[in-house]
Amino acid sequence: MKLGIVGLPNVGKSTLFNAITNAGAEVANYAFCTINPNVGVVSVPDARLDYLAEMYQPKKKTPAVIEFVDIAGLVKGASKGEGLGNKFLSNIRATDAIVHVVRCFDDENVMHVEGSTDPLRDIEIIDLELIMADIEMIQRRIDKAAKAGKSGDKSSLHEADVFRGLLEHLNDGKSARTYDCSDEDRALLETSDLLSIKPVIYAANLDENTFAAGYEDCKYYQQVRDLAASQGAQVLPICAKVEQEIGELEPDERAMFLEELGIEESGLDRLIQCSYSLLGLISFLTCGSDECRAWTITRGTKAPQAAGKIHSDFERGFIRAEIVAFDDLKACGSMAVAKEKGLVRSEGKDYVMHDGDVTLFRFNV
């Protein structure tokens, strides 16, 4: 999974990136400090994997990972190539979802590229640039589909109609992700390289005092929260500066720091949970003396396709999956006891994987 961290210059996105990846991207109080996207790979915390590693004592423990990309700050006109627009748009196209960092604090010492704090305006600026880039691309798709449709190709004619409907929606200043259409048409749009169709998490970046005192009464946060609700997006209240402090601590010091702040989970943990929920992702686990590993799949994935995540041969020669729910395995204390109690099931090719399935795939090629 790849998440693109975007936002206007000086809203805190590089600070947030540093916090969650400890990558040390340069942070400066001026536009375009992040010219090339910084990339960081973050392990997904999973207590289930930790438990299995304790049980099996494998040579290697491999968590699932998320790739974060800190993408250059955007300004008006990016869709026309202004600022770093062209590079910004190509980088965002390669991501699975967008983490849109929105400034929700006043600070006269940190300049805002638009001169004032207004989260709804900031969101609109980036949304509009993505929409304008999509309009240009969709117009080309309409022309291509319409041309193919002249020969009587019904699927091309249908594509052209779908794209025309979306174009009207985009011309109203609305993003592709809010376009109402059938599941079949949605699948077509999701394979069309649209920017504004990508799922969004709004990271509402608060100052330390507001974050500590309670952000529910912050007018800026309320604006972002209400907008996210209207779009079916998610909002994550966060303080990038606090997260950066957490990221600089040793692991055993972090829990104490969080407790002092009255926070149960770090922003990174909450962001990962948000990402999995937004993209409909779950994890299954494999374990043995060589390796214990967590694998990320889309909810609804069947056993053969999950096996293919490990190796294409596993999917091609799939025979069955031997599965036990993690909670059942933990309650039993060992795989041997789980088998004695009949909790290890043999599942076929139509089995839909569940979050936390501890799995052994049987295959033959």
Task: Annotate each PLM feature.
Residues 32, 46-49, 62-68, 82-96, ...:
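Amphipathic alpha-helical transducer elements in NTP-driven molecular machines
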Residues 1-111, 127, 140, 144-145:
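Conserved G1/Walker A P-loop phosphate-binding module
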Residues 2-6, 11, 17, 139, ...:
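C-terminal-of-GTPase-core extension/linker across diverse P-loop GTPases
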Residues 40-45, 72-82, 93-154, 169-182, ...:
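Conserved Switch II/interswitch segment of TRAFAC-class P-loop GTPases
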